[in-house]
UniProtKB/Swiss-Prot annotation:
The gene is pepA. It comes from Aliivibrio fischeri (strain ATCC 700601 / ES114). This is Probable cytosol aminopeptidase. Its main location: cytoplasm. Belongs to the peptidase M17 family. Binds 2 manganese ions per subunit.
Amino acid sequence: MEFSVKSGSPEKQRSACIVVGVFEPRRLSPIAEQLDKISGGYISSLLRRGDLEGKPGQMLLLHQVPNILSERVLLVGCGKERELGERQYKDIIKKTISTLNETGSMEAVCFLTELHVKGRDTYWKVRQAVESTKDSLYTFNQFKSNKPETRRPLRKLVFNVPTRRELNLGEKAIAHGLSIASGVKASKDLGNMPPNVANPAYLASQARRLADDYETVTTKIIGEEEMKKLGMTSYLAVGQGSHNESMMSIMEYKGHPDPAAKPIVLIGKGLTFDSGGISIKPSEGMDEMKYDMCGAASVFGAMKALAKLNLPLNVVGVLAGCENMPSSNSYRPGDILTTMSGQTVEVLNTDAEGRLVLCDALTYVERYEPECVVDVATLTGACVVALGHHISGLISNHNPLAHELINASEQSGDRAWRLPMAEEYNEQLSSPFADMGNIGGKAAGTITAGCFLSRFAKKYHWAHIDSAGTAWVSGANKGSTGRPVSLLVQFLLNRSGQENEE
């Protein structure tokens, strides 16, 4: 699909469709007023008859409006003008795209990017419109024998910006939005793949393909034999019940003018299926445990977006892939594992496996002497209890890094909330037989999981994002969300100084 920006008055647009906003109660936006004036009051007369109230998401498609060059005009309900916020704006864009796609408008000029959204500029509105459009059009039907096809799909979308001075900003927003949307799609595709396809070897193949596609990326795969030599006993223990080999995929992106510049490291938990192991999960909803690799999927998506953007950074992306299955070879509650760091862990629950994989990955990346490390994991059900399905959890040992990530989450709309990591929580991890247990009881489960990981991240600035509540949705529209790719890429854009430069 093709995106572009232009600056011009609506009456001069010759397109299949012009998209303009209508506010409650039946009040035309400034652009819609211009069209109404040219049409001799045709649009306002329809509103007076009650054809459209202006409620958020309402749509009214008009054909052959008098004196308008375009074939159609789509009126989009935007709610009350002063209450148009970020979430409502993105929802309106998605509904608009669905309507255009269903009605056979193969091209459109969209004036919704001129609407006032509280606290947001043209760059944000155009970029979010691109990301929301791609999100709205996303499908995952690789395994369906009959694939539905849109007869006349939307192929070209032009966003109008208020002034010619903002054209460069709009083009930058489109470039950023397309790169991020590409990363989100890659993350969604990985997450939605069934676990009989997307095993650790499949993750590794995707990492290799990224290196084939971009000369700035090199990929290395660490299998079980090398893990044994490295002393990654904890990581290996989690996967030893599965016939699928554990594999850690390491993608190195070098875009910094100084190749020796310290890298930012992103680590993703890649449990391609998590049965819980010997501490087996309930059968209801277990199919969704294919999404336990969404942390790795989001890191992969962020690396793809990074390569597309060609940012002047050095970044290492780690996909910590393995599978947690019950068998006679599985690790057990009561086992004591010696981690790569030398610290010992008593296994109290084999379903708290993500931290046992991540702890060795966190130790492994010390060799890069990183500028900072961010790990992403669908780690705890406790995070869903604490924050629900809208906001990811964030824990960090470095205040400035935490603030950077929270700021990036607000900028991108992919929100995170910082949780405390006070010393007292560490007491819940104590074990009479090892340096620590792998769980800290029912209370503050997200925080104690973060405290566990922090013990392996003492040599660098570190943050942990728990996306257990945000990485996928359940129900009729079940599927991966691609989060927190947008947050991660915004963080990298900010680090590179290219967040919204004109």
